[in-house]
Swiss-Prot record:
GO BP terms in the entry: selenocysteine biosynthetic process; seryl-tRNA aminoacylation
Pfam families hit by this protein: Seryl_tRNA_N, tRNA-synt_2b
Gene name linked to the record: serS
Reactions it catalyzes: tRNA(Ser) + L-serine + ATP = L-seryl-tRNA(Ser) + AMP + diphosphate + H(+); tRNA(Sec) + L-serine + ATP = L-seryl-tRNA(Sec) + AMP + diphosphate + H(+)
Protein name: Serine--tRNA ligase
Domain notes: Consists of two distinct domains, a catalytic core and a N-terminal extension that is involved in tRNA binding.
Species of origin: Limosilactobacillus fermentum (strain NBRC 3956 / LMG 18251)
Length: 432
């Protein structure tokens, strides 16, 4: 949520900055009109309350003088009705103002590439060399299906498209990956959390998924509850409505959860494989910081995500997303994209974002600065990493010509000595 006081003070600046995110100037004008109307209605209410107090005083004086107070009583009754009518107008106006503010995205940070499309992202660095194959590399779904460790067909019978069974060493690889990710993050000072997977609408509003992106999630019929689209939601809401002791900041938390997404608007995109699923595992990182810490912490969070890829030996690059491509709540986002040899392109595996006080303002999360003044915390979130996409990249980058897949060295301890996934060991029940 943006600060209405700041919008009131710098309307042209907000129009200019938010125009880079597709916001029309008229949307800011509407917010300002509703804000002006609100202040006018509140002033009228205060005037009437003063009038009511004066009428009450007249009634008291008349009664003490044993005179008729009928006129003052009638006046007070009328003023009361007028105040009630104004209160209803204030409530309706506040609802409109709140709704309009809730649809405005965060202001992009200085230096974020300006574009109304995803084109124009700035590459910050490229790490690792793409493997040169002496055979035609297969897509991850082909490798997984041939080995029997990814079963899209049976998942389709049970759940429909964009679902998968991980089987045998496929399930073990998924588990090894998220355990490795969590272990690495905890070494960097993150506290592991196992959060709820179903949250209420207020939690979804707090992190910015609601009201604008309701069509992208799965909601429980007849209840004000939603399956989480990312662990960012329950993790960021952990301190909602609280004043966090300043000496605790920054706070780092991490969690593995399933993520549930309807993928509305994705028809025809990535219809095969693990890239775009309705349900997928993801390890999330969330930080709460003081206001002067968040940009340094964004760099650290991005490095935490990169650490996983570097230890897995996967080539990737880091880009800064454009003003219109980053998430609704973000002021700046760094994406990590993995090299997928069969697709011959990079695919996103992590987004690390600084949301400044945008989410904290919605969730009323604060701390006291050195002067004892309440300040909103800054929140950051990042994938560390999307597990299925990382697994897909391992299958493609570590594939062998005979169809087997070499297990990255750092994951071998999770496999109790197995170093390669083959047709013979991939799915034990297939060998009976």
């Amino acid at each position: 949520m943006l600060d209405i006081k700041q919008i009131r003070q710098q309307p042209d600046w907000f129009k200019e900055k938010l125009a880079t995110r597709g916001v029309q100037p008229e949307e800011i004008d509407t917010v300002l009109e509703l804000d002006a109307k609100r202040r006018e209605l509140l002033q009228q209410t205060e005037t009437l309350k003063a009038k009511r107090n004066e009428a009450s005083k007249k009634i008291g004086e008349a009664k003490r003088a044993k005179q008729s107070a009928d006129e003052a009583i009638a006046e007070m009754r009328q003023v009361g009705e007028d105040i009630k009518a104004l209160d209803e107008q204030v409530e309706a106006n506040d609802k409109d103002l709140f709704d309009k503010l809730a649809h405005l995205p965060n202001v992009p940070h200085e230096g974020v590439p300006v574009s109304l499309t995803e084109d124009g992202a700035e590459e910050l660095r490229k790490v690792g060399q793409a493997r040169q194959f002496d055979f035609e590399p297969k897509h991850h779904w082909e490798i997984g299906e041939n080995l029997g460790i990814l079963d899209f067909e049976r998942a389709g019978k049970v759940s429909g498209s964009r679902f998968v069974y991980y089987v045998g060493l496929g399930a073990q690889l998924e588990r090894a990956l998220y355990n490795f990710m969590l272990d690495e993050h905890m070494k960097e000072g993150y506290t592991e959390v196992l959060p709820p997977y179903i949250v209420n609408a207020h939690a979804m509003y707090g992190t910015g998924q609601f009201p604008k992106f309701k069509q992208d999630v799965y909601q429980v019929n007849g209840e004000d509850m939603t399956l989480i689209p990312t662990a960012e939601v329950p993790l960021t809401n952990y301190f909602a409505g609280e004043v966090i002791p300043a000496e605790k900041l920054p706070v780092y938390v991490t969690a593995l959860t399933p993520s549930f997404r309807s993928e509305a608007g994705s028809a025809g995109r990535d219809t095969r494989g693990l890239i775009r699923m309705h349900q997928f595992n993801k390890v999330e990182m969330v930080k709460y910081t003081k206001q002067d810490q968040s940009w340094e912490e964004l760099d650290k969070m991005t490095a935490n995500a990169e650490n996983i890829l570097q230890k897995l030996g996967l080539p990737y690059h880091v880009i800064t997303l454009t003003t219109s491509d980053m998430s609704f709540t973000a002021s700046e986002t760094h994406d990590l994209e993995l090299w997928m040899p069969a697709q011959n392109k990079y695919r996103e595996v992590s987004s690390c974002s600084n949301c400044l006080d945008f989410q904290a303002r919605r969730l009323h999360m604060q701390y006291r600065d050195e002067n004892g003044k309440l300040q909103y915390v800054h929140t950051l979130n990042g994938s560390g990493l999307a597990v299925g996409r990382t697994l897909a990249a391992i299958l493609e980058n570590y594939q062998n010509e005979d169809g087997s897949v070499t297990i990255p060295e750092v994951l071998v301890p999770y496999f109790h000595g197995i170093t390669k996934i083959t047709k013979e060991n991939a799915v034990p029940f297939n060998n009976k």
